[in-house]
Regions:
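Extracytoplasmic beta-rich repeat domains
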Residues: 184-186, 190-205, 215-218, 234-255, ...
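Membrane-embedded alpha-helical segments of integral membrane proteins
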Residues: 36-86
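Loop/turn-rich, solvent-exposed surfaces of beta-rich toroidal or solenoidal domains
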Residues: 407, 432-501
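Blade-level signature of beta-propeller repeat domains, shared across WD40, Kelch, NHL, RCC1
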Residues: 407, 518-546
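Conserved blade-register residue in beta-propeller folds
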Residues: 221-223, 272, 322-324, 367, ...
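Aromatic (tryptophan-biased) beta-strands that constitute blades/sheets of beta-rich domains
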Residues: 126-195, 220-243, 279-292, 331-336, ...
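Internal/C-terminal transmembrane anchor helices
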Residues: 89-114
Length: 546
C-alpha cells in the first residue's frame, strides 16, 4: 500500500517545457550536427576515391570523382544553410543572394583555360588574351619572304623529318653522345618565343623546322629557321578546332619528304605544300571524301610517307578506314578497312617477313598491305577509350600495343599460317597494367620498354611477361625519346630530363626547365638541337655533347 504521505515522482520536463534560455542554448548545438555530418561524409567520399582499387589505374577518373565528391559536399552544405539553419527568412534570402553573387563574381573574373592530362583545371584571369590571338596579326602576310631561299630537299643524318623521328619510333641516332650533366654544362638557349596553339611537334630537315599551329581563326602550317626562330613562311586556312578538355588547334605533326610538306589539320584537311614557299600543291578533305565523322578531340594522324604514297587514317566506313594518295599528284591510290579512327598514326613495319602498315584504330589494331591496302590481320583492342600510343614492332614477329585509361598494354605474336595468311595472338596471358601510357608513346631499348604510366611515373617494362622492372620520377603526361642509351623525357610541366635507359634501376641524371605551362607536344632532336613547344611557346636549345 502506497504511503499517502510520500511526494509524487517528478516527471522529466519536455523539451518545450524547458525555460526559453535553455531551449535557445540547445538549438545551436543540434543545428551544427548536420553540417558536421555533411563534412564528414564529404571527407569519407574523398578518402574512398583516393584509395579504392578501381581508380588505381586511372588518375583522370580519380580526379573527376574527387571533384564530384567535393561538389556534392558543397551542394549539401548550401542546401542545409538555406533550408535548415532556422535563420529568419530574410537572413536566408541574403545568404542565398550573397552565395550566388560570390559565384557569379568569381566566374566573371576567371575562366578555365584547359585542363591537365589528369583533368586538373587551369584557371586564368578572364581578360588574359590567348596566345594564338596575340599572334594572329603576325601572320597576316603569309608566304615566303622575298629574301629567303628555302630548300627542304637537302637532307642529312641529323634530320628529324616526321612524327617521332626518322623511323617514327621515338629513337634518335646521334653521332656524338649527349653530355649527362646539365648543371655543369647547361643547354644553351638558341631562341625562345610565343607560338600559336596546338599539340603538333616540329619536323626538322636541315636548317628548317615545320610545325602546325592555331593563330586566331586560322589553322596554319609554319616554317621556322632553326638557328633564329624566324618565321620564314606560313600557310593558313580558315578553321578552328577547340575543346575545353583537349585544347585548341591542330594535333598532328607535319611530314617532310622530297622537299614537300604533308600536313593533316584537326578538321581533316590534308595539304601537300611546296617546302620552299608553303604554297598548296594539292589538298583533300579526308573526312568529307570518306564519309567519316571527326573525332571527339580532333584528327591527330600524322601523315606517313611510304615510298610514293601518303597514308592517313580517315576512319570512314565501307572500306574507307585507311587511305593512300600519290604523294606527287594527290590522286587516291587505294582505300581499305572498316574501322573508325582513333588518335594514332600509320607506321610501316615488317612482321613475320611481310611488310605492312600498322594503324591503331578505335576498336582494333589493323595491318594493311602497302601495295593495295588489303587488311592482312586485325586484333580487337579492348575498351571504348581513345587509343593514342603508337604500336611498337619488336623483333621479327611481335608488336606491343598500349593505352591509358586503366587498360594497359599487350604483346602480340604475328604469325603466318600454312596458307600464308597472317594472324595475331596474345603473347602474354593477360594485359599488363604495369604501363598505361595515356597520350604519350613508349620506346624500346635492348629488350625493355620505357614509358610514362598514366601521368604518374616513368616505367621500365620487361617484355617477357609484362612485369615492371622499376618505376620512378614524376613527369605527368609528358613525352619521351630514346637517344643512344639515354631517355630524353619531357615532363607535362615543361621540364626536360635525361634518364638512364637501363632495367637495373631508375636514375635521373639531369634536367632543366625548357618551357612554361602544360606541354603535351613531342620534342624533336635534330643533331644537338632540341626543339620543344606547347600551346603557347616554342624554344630551341643547343644540348652539350660529350
Amino acid at each position: 500500500m502506497d504511503n499517502p504521505s510520500s511526494e509524487p515522482a517528478m516527471e522529466a520536463p519536455r523539451p518545450n517545457s524547458l525555460p526559453k534560455a535553455e531551449r535557445t542554448e540547445a538549438r545551436p548545438a543540434r543545428r551544427w550536427r548536420w553540417p558536421i555530418a555533411i563534412l564528414a561524409l564529404g571527407a569519407a567520399l574523398v578518402f574512398v576515391v583516393q584509395n579504392v582499387e578501381r581508380f588505381e589505374n586511372n588518375a583522370a577518373d580519380q580526379n573527376l570523382a574527387t571533384l564530384s565528391a567535393i561538389g556534392l559536399t558543397v551542394l549539401l552544405l548550401a542546401f542545409w544553410a538555406i533550408f535548415f539553419t532556422g535563420l529568419p527568412r530574410g537572413a536566408r534570402t541574403r545568404l542565398l543572394v550573397g552565395g550566388v553573387a560570390l559565384i557569379a563574381g568569381f566566374l566573371s573574373l576567371v575562366r578555365v583555360d584547359g585542363v591537365s592530362g589528369d583533368i586538373r583545371p587551369k584557371l586564368v584571369w578572364r581578360w588574359s588574351p590567348k596566345a594564338d590571338a596575340r599572334l594572329a596579326k603576325e601572320i597576316a602576310g603569309e608566304g615566303k619572304p622575298a629574301d629567303a631561299t628555302i630548300d627542304l630537299t637537302q637532307t642529312s643524318d641529323d634530320d628529324f623529318p616526321q612524327f617521332l623521328g626518322p623511323s617514327r619510333n621515338g629513337q634518335v641516332v646521334v653521332r656524338q653522345a649527349l653530355a649527362r650533366d646539365w648543371a655543369a654544362r647547361p643547354p644553351k638557349t638558341v631562341w625562345r618565343q610565343p607560338i600559336g596553339a596546338g599539340w603538333s611537334s616540329f619536323a626538322v630537315v636541315g636548317p628548317y623546322a615545320i610545325t602546325q599551329e592555331q593563330r586566331g581563326d586560322r589553322e596554319c602550317v609554319t616554317c621556322y629557321e632553326v638557328s633564329t626562330g624566324k618565321l620564314l613562311w606560313a600557310h593558313a586556312e580558315g578553321g578552328h578546332f577547340n575543346k575545353l578538355l583537349g585544347g585548341e588547334g591542330p594535333r598532328a605533326t607535319p611530314t617532310i619528304s622530297g622537299g614537300r610538306v604533308y600536313a593533316l589539320g584537326a578538321n581533316g584537311r590534308l595539304d601537300c605544300l611546296d617546302g620552299a614557299s608553303g604554297e598548296v600543291v594539292w589538298t583533300h578533305d579526308v573526312l568529307a571524301e570518306n564519309n567519316a565523322p571527326n573525332l571527339e578531340w580532333g584528327k591527330s594522324c600524322s601523315p606517313a610517307v611510304i615510298d610514293d604514297l601518303v597514308v592517313v587514317s580517315a576512319g570512314g566506313p565501307d572500306g574507307h578506314s585507311l587511305v593512300a594518295f600519290d604523294k606527287a599528284s594527290g590522286d587516291e591510290i587505294w582505300h581499305a578497312g572498316d574501322d573508325p579512327s582513333s588518335y594514332s598514326s600509320p607506321l610501316l613495319a615488317t612482321l613475320a617477313g611481310v611488310e605492312q602498315i600498322l594503324i591503331v584504330n578505335h576498336h582494333a589494331i589493323v595491318a594493311h598491305d602497302p601495295a593495295n591496302g588489303r587488311v592482312l590481320w586485325r586484333y580487337p583492342w579492348i575498351g571504348d577509350q581513345p587509343k593514342v600510343p603508337q604500336p611498337v614492332p619488336i623483333g621479327a614477329d611481335k608488336v606491343l600495343i598500349a593505352s591509358g585509361y586503366g587498360i594497359g598494354c599487350m604483346l602480340l605474336d604475328i604469325k603466318a599460317g600454312p596458307d600464308g595468311e597472317l594472324s595475331a595472338s596474345e603473347a602474354w596471358k593477360k594485359h599488363s597494367l604495369k604501363l598505361k601510357p595515356k597520350f604519350t608513346n613508349v620506346v624500346l631499348h635492348e629488350g625493355f620498354v620505357y614509358g610514362l604510366d598514366d601521368g604518374r611515373s616513368l616505367v621500365c617494362l620487361d617484355l617477357t611477361r609484362g612485369e615492371r622492372k622499376w618505376q620512378g620520377g614524376h613527369y605527368g603526361h609528358g613525352q619521351i625519346l630514346l637517344v643512344g642509351d639515354l631517355l630524353l623525357v619531357q615532363s607535362e610541366e615543361g621540364d626536360v630530363a635525361l634518364v638512364e635507359a637501363t632495367p637495373k634501376r631508375y636514375r635521373e641524371l639531369t634536367r632543366f626547365k625548357a618551357l612554361e605551362g602544360k606541354t603535351w607536344n613531342n620534342p624533336a632532336l635534330a643533331g644537338r638541337y632540341l626543339l620543344v613547344r606547347n600551346a603557347e611557346e616554342a624554344a630551341c636549345y643547343e644540348l652539350p655533347l660529350e
